[in-house]
Curated annotation (Swiss-Prot):
Protein name: Uncharacterized protein YdiL
Gene3D superfamilies (UniProt xref): Putative cytoplasmic protein
Gene Ontology MF term list: DNA binding
Gene name of the encoded protein: ydiL
SUPFAM superfamilies the UniProt entry points to: lambda repressor-like DNA-binding domains (SSF47413)
Length: 118
């Protein structure tokens, strides 16, 4: 993974550098994350693995929902959770990363006019 791909995935999941340093790198070291995005330092394998796993989970959710959309008639609506607390009211076992993946999927489907958000 290169610096551009790192930035792209951070944006796809609508995460700040500080959030990525805390939840993905699990170090809280925002400066290191900035260096990775600027291409000044190599991205640690564990960070790459975590992001690729998130990307795969997102892809899996997208495909599952698109399949459901293709098999149903009527309104297509998907919940949009403004914050982690609202997400955890519906998905009590969900964590911050789960919420970001869910929101990314919801935004993608809305952007392609496949789902309405509620």
């Amino acid at each position: 993974m290169n610096a551009y791909e790192l930035q792209a995935l951070r944006h796809i999941f609508a995460m700040t550098i500080d959030e990525c340093a805390t939840w993905i790198a699990q170090t809280g070291d925002s400066e290191s994350w900035r260096q990775w995005e600027n291409g000044k330092c190599a991205i640690p394998d564990r960070v790459v693995e975590q992001l690729l796993a998130m990307r795969q989970q997102r892809k899996k959710h997208l495909h599952a929902i698109i399949e459901k959309i293709n098999n149903r008639i009527g309104n297509n609506t998907m919940r949009f959770f403004p914050d982690l607390t609202a997400f955890q009211r519906v998905y009590p076992d969900g964590n911050f990363i789960d919420w970001k993946i869910y929101q990314s999927v919801a935004a993608e489907l809305y952007a392609h006019d496949l789902e309405r958000l509620c």
